[in-house]
């Protein structure tokens, strides 16, 4: 009898051990299943947010094209594309974003314009109009004159196609090769204003001050739409006038702008204290329409976000062409 009881006790221990192992295995399987379900849910939400962002991009494109059709000769802040803080609810989330006119700012690539024959880069008074205007913008942002000249010429050397210094104030490969880590100048147009951070003299603080006033277009032309410069960007208008008008005058004119913008630039220039004819190069820069636009879009699904940055250009017959799309990823 004692032997039978011992065998029964051993059998019970074995059964309990097997049950314990089965519970542990079941618990692990349950944990893994929950983890896989969460992963699947996150992947599904990420893909859904991405396609929502793509849908928002398509909506922006349609809105821009419709605005072009409604008024092909004028682009202004009263049009549908310029709506601020728009929120569109969608299943399980929402869409937000904004569209920026990339001709309401200074095109950094316009600084790549070469000097005329016989003109020295060190002769500050004989530089191309975009160079003078950018230096004036830096002055409005309280950058010292010498630093402004250095920074302007460093950007010129970054965006031009050669490796020769534009002036004694510039910076080419020799300067950047001495940095840690070393790198070379692009010697081509900037693709984005983010490239400014790689240029000599552009600190994080200076970049933050410059960012609202500058852009990088695939062109060396400087064209600024006076209908989309905001009053808080009045320093840009002062710079385009090469400091021949005051900041208060520029703000006053921009604040009094008609809701649907000026139909022609003369309606604006006639209000400025300095006649247009006294500033060589300015007339060719001012415009009342735009061709380049940037959309920054955010799609939210649950706790997941997808970011998308798209740049469009207006082509022939007011059709919109995608120039660049940057996927900010899901987060």
Curated annotation (Swiss-Prot):
One of its GO terms (cellular component) is plasma membrane. NCBIfam families: T2SS_GspK. This is Type II secretion system protein K. It comes from the Bacteria. GO terms for biological process: protein secretion. Its main location: membrane. Type II secretion is composed of four main components: the outer membrane complex, the inner membrane complex, the cytoplasmic secretion ATPase and the periplasm-spanning pseudopilus. Interacts with core component ExeG. Belongs to the GSP K family. Pfam families: T2SSK, T2SSK_1st. PANTHER family: TYPE II SECRETION SYSTEM PROTEIN K, TYPE II SECRETION SYSTEM PROTEIN K-RELATED. InterPro entries: GspK, GspK_central_sf, Pilin-like, T2SSK_SAM-like_1st, T2SSK_SAM-like_2nd. The gene is exeK. Cleaved by prepilin peptidase.
């Amino acid at each position: 009898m004692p032997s039978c009881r011992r065998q029964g006790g051993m059998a019970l221990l074995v059964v309990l051990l097997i049950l314990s192992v089965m519970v542990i295995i079941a618990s692990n399987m349950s944990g893994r299943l929950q983890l896989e379900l969460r992963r699947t849910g996150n992947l599904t939400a990420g893909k859904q947010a991405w396609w929502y962002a793509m849908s928002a991009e398509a909506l922006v494109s349609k809105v821009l094209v419709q605005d072009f059709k409604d008024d092909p000769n004028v682009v202004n802040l009263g049009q549908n594309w310029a709506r601020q803080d728009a929120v569109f609810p969608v299943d399980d989330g929402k869409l937000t974003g904004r569209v920026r006119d990339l001709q309401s700012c200074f095109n950094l690539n316009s600084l790549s314009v070469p000097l005329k024959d016989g003109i020295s880069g060190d002769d500050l008074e004989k530089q191309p109009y975009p160079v003078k205007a950018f230096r004036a913008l830096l002055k409005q942002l309280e950058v010292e004159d010498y630093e402004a000249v250095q920074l302007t010429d460093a950007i010129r050397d970054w965006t031009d196609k050669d490796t020769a210094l534009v002036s004694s104030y510039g910076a080419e490969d020799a300067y950047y090769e001495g940095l840690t880590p070393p790198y070379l100048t692009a010697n081509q147009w900037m693709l984005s204003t983010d490239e400014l951070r790689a240029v000599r003299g552009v600190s994080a603080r200076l970049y933050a001050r410059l960012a609202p006033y500058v852009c990088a277009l695939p062109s060396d032309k400087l064209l600024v739409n006076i209908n989309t410069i905001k009053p808080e960007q009045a320093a840009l208008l002062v710079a385009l006038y090469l400091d021949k008008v005051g900041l208060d005058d520029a703000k006053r004119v921009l604040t009094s702008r008609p809701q649907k913008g000026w139909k022609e630039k003369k309606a604006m220039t006639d209000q400025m204290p300095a006649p247009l004819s006294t500033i060589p190069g300015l007339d060719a820069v001012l415009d009342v329409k735009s061709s380049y636009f940037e959309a920054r879009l955010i799609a939210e699904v649950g706790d997941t976000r997808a970011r998308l940055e798209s740049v469009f250009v207006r082509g022939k017959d007011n059709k919109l062409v995608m120039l660049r799309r940057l996927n900010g990823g899901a987060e």
